[in-house]
Amino acid sequence: MDVGAVRVHPFSLSRVIAILSAAIISLSAFKVSGQDLMGPHPYIKAEIIFGGDLMGHGMQIAAAKDETTGTYSYQRVFRHIAPILMSHDAAVANLEVTLAGAPYTGYPLFSSPVAFAEAARDAGIGVLTTANNHAVDRGLQGIRSTIKSLDSLSVKHTGTYSDAADRAARVPLVVEAGGLSLALLSYTYGTNGIPVPEPAVVNLIDRELIAADIERAKKMECDAIVAFMHWGREYDTMPSPFQKELAEWLFAEGADIIIGSHPHVIQPVEHIRSAGSGRDRLVAYSLGNLVSNQRWRRTDGGMLLSIRLSVYGDQLIIERAGYILTWVHTPLSSRGRREFEIVPAAHFEKHFELIGDSSQYNQMRLFINDSRRFMGSNAKSIDELRGERLEMILPCR
């Protein structure tokens, strides 16, 4: 079956045998602290995928609008990556717009139609972080409308709250994924100088606040704590000293995974194997843009980060961490307007006919080559998932 040019669930006998054989060999050989995982001890795993910034520039809003009906649809945006997202137990991305209602606007004060978040949900993104520098672009009404809209879509979210009581009831956000419970926390460096309107709350990067939130997550005995940090300098490919120091502090406090956003370009990823603590760690300083109208070099794409987590007693193991390069294709529609669609870059790289435009194809290749060179030097224990490697993470469900 071929969905959106991404092959899903190819049920060839040889592939099934290969997958089962690999799984049996892996489990039979995999031990933690001398204990065989095939034994009686509890062993639970989950597949989680993280995406970067969901931006909503004016051109994207125009592309989504049906001029005849006045309605909006973003389903095309996510169709090529939906099979990848849906093959995981949970998918999370950063919603860097408000859902404040009309008038719909892009930069600098973002407000997108609810259809944007709806399409992301339909593609498999069930969790959105909302603490970012555009969280208060439309004031108190924008914060409350965004929360209400996401609740109505049954999309889980974390980072902004109607008031202190709302925050107390929602922090941490606990997500069940594949038998594991994940505590998700989201914070931002600021809100573009716009004061947070009372009584609303936006999680800012405040160490006393973060430490208290992590402590609360620990008391809830969640299997893993994931901190989403909106930080760093825009368009810098390397993390700042502040990001590095804060990441070390977050790990020391008890965070297991750190996912960064805001730079709008890919930054390094580090998978840190446990050395005595019994818990693996991972930090992705920035996943880049999942979708936007930014077309400058390195901003026109990003990466999906796929992680297989397992818990064995009190130990957390990141069995596999890999990245999937994504690029924002902007084909010209029959209406004469640019459309927006996120494509798995490695797959489209092999099929020029799926792009059909030399200029865009070459731009995509430039993004791919830049990203592979960068990740080759700045991804610790992380591999690109493409071809057969990508198919192997798509379970036969």
Question: Where in this protein do the model-derived segments appear?
Answer:
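Bacterial N-terminal signal peptides that target proteins for export
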Residues: 5-18
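Acidic, metal/ion-coordinating pockets
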Residues: 30-397
